[in-house]
């Protein structure tokens, strides 16, 4: 036999009744209490829900069904395009940010990225499908140069890197400086790249760029960065800076920090920057007749004219010569578009090396 169940009267008295009892009278206050089983409660709840659903259907706007039909007739949203496989021997990330519609917009950055792609494919043997382009002209949301997408692309570039991998990172856009808060900068300033949404999402500072792009490089892997932006000298936070004189002599400056390791995991990293950390880069129509980054143009021209396997020193001298030639021509007609026409390309590296003995190979 099923055990009795407990009920409580409104006066507080506890009573024990049979499971199938429908009423019970309190022996203290003589109040009669109606009893309900769990089945009765469930049935009542179902009736309430059913009635509420009918009420909603009666008062639903007539055009709602039409809206539902239209939504069902529309094709499903396009899935985000996946990134290409990161496991090719040659791969690149090219970012060009014009900041369209902003008061600080630029004119030649997207063209710079496209010119770099042509160089890598036509001259350096990079497969077209191993090059990730991030510009405002791209159709895929994943290819817009936002902070999130640039970070994701940088991680893709070095993911699973191996010996003999050749990796290229190019950025053409705005660069800037901000206060260094971890004490790893000699000048007290962090360098940063400005993605399209930097006003809301923030900049990408050199500490993070080094952590993502430089630190994971394994023995035998090689990264070349080409940065066409202001304040970009040490934007990869590489520890050695090559100071090249006009007569071709050079010396390495050691910027290693005791607070943080800025090298690789055995690989090699090189960066060609448009200018020093405290300088501005230039855009000029003198090279091609339309606005283009002076740094990007001089790099491409030097690679094309240097001959097979030039040294880093030869390449850097050719780049500086191209910039100086442009400066002379622009000084004559006064249409240089940068605030610092004296800026020249700068080479930084994860290690010191003989720039006139080491071959530049992508």
From Swiss-Prot:
What taxonomic ancestry is recorded?
A: Eukaryota, Viridiplantae, Streptophyta, Embryophyta, Tracheophyta
Q: Which organism is it from?
A: Arabidopsis thaliana (Mouse-ear cress)
Q: Which family does it belong to?
A: Belongs to the peptidase C14B family.
Q: Give the record's keywords alphabetically.
A: Hydrolase, Protease, Thiol protease
The Gene Ontology biological process terms listed for this entry are: proteolysis
* Protein name in UniProt: Metacaspase-3
Catalytic residue list: 174, 230
InterPro entries from the entry?
Caspase-like_dom_sf, Metacaspase, Pept_C14_caspase
> What GO molecular function annotations does the UniProt record carry, in alphabetical order?
cysteine-type endopeptidase activity
Q: Has keyword Repressor?
A: no
Statement: the UniProt record of this protein carries the keyword Protease: yes
What domain of life?
Answer: Eukaryota
EC number(s) per UniProt? 3.4.22.-
């Amino acid at each position: 036999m099923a055990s009795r169940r407990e009920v409580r009267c409104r006066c507080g008295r506890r009573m024990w009744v049979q499971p199938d009892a429908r009423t019970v009278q309190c022996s203290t206050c003589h109040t009669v209490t109606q009893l309900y089983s769990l089945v009765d409660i469930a049935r009542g709840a179902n009736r309430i829900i059913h009635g509420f659903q009918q009420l909603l259907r009666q008062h639903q706007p007539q055009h709602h069904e039409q809206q539902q039909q239209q939504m069902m007739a529309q094709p499903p949203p396009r899935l985000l395009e996946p990134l290409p496989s990161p496991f090719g021997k040659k791969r690149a990330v090219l970012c060009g940010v014009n900041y369209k519609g902003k008061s600080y917009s630029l004119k030649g950055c997207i063209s710079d990225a496209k010119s770099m792609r042509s160089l890598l494919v036509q001259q350096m043997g990079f497969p077209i499908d191993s090059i990730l382009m991030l510009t405002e002209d791209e159709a895929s949301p994943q290819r817009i140069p936002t902070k999130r997408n640039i970070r994701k692309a940088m991680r893709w570039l070095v993911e699973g890197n191996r010996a003999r991998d050749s990796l290229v990172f190019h950025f053409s856009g705005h660069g800037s400086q901000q206060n260094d808060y971890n004490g790893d900068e000699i000048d007290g300033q962090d360098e940063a790249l400005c993605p399209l949404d930097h006003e809301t999402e923030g900049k990408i500072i050199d500490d993070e760029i080094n952590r993502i792009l430089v630190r994971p490089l394994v023995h035998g892997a090689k990264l070349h960065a080409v940065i066409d932006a202001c304040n970009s000298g040490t934007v990869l936070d590489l520890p050695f800076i090559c100071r090249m004189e006009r007569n071709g002599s050079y010396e390495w400056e050691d910027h290693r920090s005791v607070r943080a390791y800025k090298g690789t995991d055995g690989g090699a990293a090189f960066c060609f920057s448009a200018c020093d950390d405290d300088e501005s880069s230039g855009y000029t129509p003198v090279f091609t007749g339309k606005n283009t980054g002076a740094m990007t143009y001089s790099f491409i021209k030097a690679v094309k004219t240097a001959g097979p396997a030039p040294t880093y020193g030869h390449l850097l001298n050719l780049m500086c010569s191209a910039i100086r030639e442009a400066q002379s021509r622009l000084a004559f007609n006064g249409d240089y578009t940068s605030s610092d026409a004296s800026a020249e390309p700068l080479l930084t590296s994860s290690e010191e090396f003989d720039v006139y003995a080491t071959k530049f190979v992508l």
